[in-house]
Amino acid sequence: MTANTKMMGRLIAVLFLSREIAHREHLRTKSYSQHVALNTFYDEVIEIADSITEAYQGRYGIIDDIPMLDAPPKAPIDKVLEDQLALVEKLRYSAVDKTETSIQNLIDEAVALFLSTLYKLRNLS
């Protein structure tokens, strides 16, 4: 099984940035359904990021660098989260081999949270 600590640090950084963006939009929105959906997202994504990091570090050692990422250009929150999801999906197999199912399953939880949040943002009012 192989892993790339730099890529895992970046994947975790994307989750951290997604939380920050969602929290800020949660405080700005005038839509109750968006407010609730984003609250759930920012509460849960940080727990998932923590679980991924701890499992990864249990297998491969400490991630020395989780970079601070710049915020993406201003866009509707569903588009921003969709783009952040695409980054997670792009990084996941560079960060840890697909055969490392315990860690990949935790990443699946993050992906599912993004998808559920996108559904709520786009379809519930």
How would you label these PLM feature ranges?
Residues 1, 124-125:
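Short intrinsically disordered terminal tails
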Residues 68-122:
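Acidic/histidine-rich alpha-helical segments that form the ligand environment
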Residues 30, 67-68:
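Short interaction-hotspot residues at assembly and binding interfaces
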Residues 17-40, 95-100:
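Helix-loop segments that flank and shape redox-cofactor active sites
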Residues 35-64:
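Conserved alpha-helical segments that form or flank metal/cofactor-binding pockets of metalloenzymes
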Residues 9, 13-16, 20, 39, ...:
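Generic structural signal for well-ordered, non-transmembrane alpha-helical segments
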Residues 2-13, 32-39, 71-78, 101, ...:
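Short, solvent-exposed segments of well-ordered alpha helices
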